[in-house]
Every structure is written in structure tokens, then in C-alpha cells.
Amino acid sequence: MPKNKTHSGASKRFRVTGSGKILREKAGKRHNLEKKASKVTRRMTGTTELAKADVKRAKKMLGL
């Protein structure tokens, strides 16, 4: 039986830590930043852990 392919879109969006947690970038910081407050754009920086509801789906896409 052939190997399952990793979902290329998911592999670009998610990163798996050593402990198995899935990290994602925060949304909304690509464009139209001029009208967003500095406080808001600062909150959008960095990575955060994926929501529990989405973990199962993401793991399947990543082939974990």
C-alpha cells in the first residue's frame, strides 16, 4: 500500500513541537494594517497553539 501524502497547505501553516503540540501563526496581519490599532497588530504577532477542536484534523493532514 502506498504512503499517504502530507497536505502541502497544512505543512506550510502548522509546525509540530517536540512534545507533539501543533503551533500556528495568528491571522489578520497581512494587509489593511493601517486602520488597525498598534495594540491589535501587536497581539497578532508570534505563534499560538492550535485549538483542541482542530488538532485531530490537522494531525490527519500532516500524516501524524
UniProtKB/Swiss-Prot annotation:
One of its GO terms (biological process) is translation. PROSITE patterns: RIBOSOMAL_L35. Keywords: Ribonucleoprotein, Ribosomal protein. One of its GO terms (cellular component) is cytosolic large ribosomal subunit. GO terms for molecular function: structural constituent of ribosome. InterPro entries: Ribosomal_bL35, Ribosomal_bL35-like, Ribosomal_bL35_CS, Ribosomal_bL35_sf. Pfam families: Ribosomal_L35p. Residues 1-15 have a biased composition (Basic residues). Transmembrane segments: none annotated. Residues 1-20 are annotated as: Disordered. Gene3D superfamilies: 4.10.410.60. Coiled coil: none annotated. Belongs to the bacterial ribosomal protein bL35 family. NCBIfam families: rpmI_bact (TIGR00001). This is Large ribosomal subunit protein bL35.
